[in-house]
A protein has these predicted regions:
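A short, Lys/Arg-rich alpha-helix, primarily the initiator
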Residues: 1-16, 20
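Short, charged recognition helix plus adjacent turn
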Residues: 9, 14-15, 34, 61-68
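DNA major-groove recognition helix of helix-turn-helix/homeodomain DNA-binding modules
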Residues: 44-60
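Recognition helix of helix-turn-helix/homeodomain-like DNA-binding domains
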Residues: 26-41
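Alpha-helical residues within the helix-turn-helix
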Residues: 12, 23, 51
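Residue at a beta-strand N-cap/secondary-structure junction
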Residues: 15, 40-43
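The DNA-contacting recognition helix of HTH DNA-binding domains
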Residues: 18, 29-30, 57
Length: 68
């Protein structure tokens, strides 16, 4: 799974703007766009995004890791 692309998909589905996520993360919009390009992400940032977007990315990553 490309985590950055998945974050973008969930943001779109839940109608969160880049601006609103940047504000919630206390960062610039460019940082959010940079997240979209990432194939991996640190856990503290992912945890914040889980809360902001009300989505469990950890569960998705776990399923992706252990699928047969």
């Amino acid at each position: 799974m490309h985590i950055g692309q998945r974050i973008r998909e969930i943001m779109t589905q839940k109608q969160h703007s880049v601006v609103s996520v940047a504000r919630a993360l206390d960062c610039e919009r460019t940082n959010v766009y940079n997240i979209f390009d990432r194939k991996d992400i640190n856990t503290s940032l992912l945890q914040k995004l889980c809360v902001i977007l009300d989505h469990d990315f950890f569960k998705e990553l776990s399923k992706d890791t252990f699928k047969k």
